[in-house]
């Protein structure tokens, strides 16, 4: 089962979140049938939103939109504070690797654009923030958002490793943040350790990448595990929700679906689930509108 572990240095100087998001990203790949680059881009966005949601309280919903002007198009993810996330990528078929190394490429195919977050606290006044894409690699763009929008300098690592068949092998990430009150000496030590950390892809390839991430972040510094919480890809779509959407259409449009298509099929963008509405279903909706 996927999980996020929240921890804090014994000194109180900084905190870290580490994530295993392998099943989340694998299920997203399965539902959307994404090719290599699209899988990694979508996966990184889902992991970023899992981190962002873990930072919220109450019943907030967090939407992350990575909007680029190149091959991927846009990536949309929605998460809640209970560990659930869903998402999709506009172009599922991007499959580009470096010839020499086989490394999956993401940044060059995100293009210019924006990292948008919408935090809905359930009060009717969602908070929206937009920052420019810095590299298109998503991790760096997320870190820039945290620094610029939330005024919280953060170190971020996100990645998805694929097997020889381009299926998700492992996915995860981390966030490290300096806390108020940290001394200059503690900040310098933390920055040095982060600079010396192995690449996120190397750490994810470890036998137990969650422990490898924690060890790389803290080194010999004592720390406390504050909590371990489950994560999952879960869509909250339903037939009732799409039926309500159909009810907002004019009667003429519903009648056209009956006359021309003998019904309607609605596909959820976030999970690919198909909902069928036959002629009788649509006629019932028309009668309900009368």
UniProtKB/Swiss-Prot annotation:
HAMAP family: HslO (MF_00117). CDD domains: Hsp33 (cd00498). The keyword Disulfide bond applies. The lineage of its organism: Bacteria, Bacillati, Bacillota, Bacilli, Lactobacillales. It comes from Streptococcus pyogenes serotype M28 (strain MGAS6180). Belongs to the HSP33 family. GO terms for molecular function: protein folding chaperone; unfolded protein binding. Redox regulated molecular chaperone. Protects both thermally unfolding and oxidatively damaged proteins from irreversible aggregation. Plays an important role in the bacterial defense system toward oxidative stress. InterPro entries: Heat_shock_Hsp33, Heat_shock_Hsp33_C, Heat_shock_Hsp33_N. GO terms for cellular component: cytoplasm. Disulfide bonds join 235-237, 268-271. It comes from the Bacteria. GO terms for biological process: protein refolding. Keywords: Chaperone, Cytoplasm, Disulfide bond, Redox-active center, Zinc. Under oxidizing conditions two disulfide bonds are formed involving the reactive cysteines. Under reducing conditions zinc is bound to the reactive cysteines and the protein is inactive. The keyword Disulfide bond applies. Pfam families: HSP33. SUPFAM superfamilies: Hsp33 domain (SSF64397), HSP33 redox switch-like (SSF118352). It is found in: Cytoplasm. This is 33 kDa chaperonin.
């Amino acid at each position: 089962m996927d999980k996020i572990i929240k921890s804090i240095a014994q000194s109180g100087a900084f905190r870290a979140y580490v994530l295993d998001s392998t099943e989340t990203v694998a299920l997203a790949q399965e539902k959307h049938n994404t090719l290599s680059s699209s899988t990694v881009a979508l996966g990184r966005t889902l992991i970023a939103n899992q981190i962002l949601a873990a930072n919220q309280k109450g019943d907030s919903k967090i939407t992350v939109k990575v909007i680029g002007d190149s091959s991927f198009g846009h990536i949309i993810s929605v998460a809640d504070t209970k560990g659930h996330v869903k998402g999709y990528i506009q172009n599922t078929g991007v499959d580009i690797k470096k010839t020499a190394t086989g490394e999956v490429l993401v940044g060059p195919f995100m293009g210019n654009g924006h990292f948008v977050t919408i935090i809905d606290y359930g009060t009717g006044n969602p908070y929206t923030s937009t920052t420019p894409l810095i590299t298109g690699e998503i991790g760096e763009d997320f870190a820039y958002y945290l620094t610029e929008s939330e005024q919280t300098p953060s170190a971020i690592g996100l990645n998805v490793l694929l097997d020889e068949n381009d299926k998700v092998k492992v996915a995860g990430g981390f966030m490290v943040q300096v806390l108020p009150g940290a001394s200059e000496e503690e900040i310098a030590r933390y920055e040095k350790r982060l600079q010396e950390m192995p690449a996120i892809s190397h750490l994810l390839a470890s036998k137990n990448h969650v422990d490898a991430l924690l060890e790389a972040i803290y080194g010999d510094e004592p720390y406390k595990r504050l909590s371990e919480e489950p994560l999952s890809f879960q869509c909250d779509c339903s037939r009732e929700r799409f039926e309500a959407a159909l009810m907002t259409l004019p009667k003429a449009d519903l009648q056209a679906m009956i006359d021309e298509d003998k019904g309607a099929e609605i596909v959820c963008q976030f999970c690919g689930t198909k909902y069928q509405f036959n002629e009788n279903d649509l006629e019932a909706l028309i009668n309900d509108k009368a």
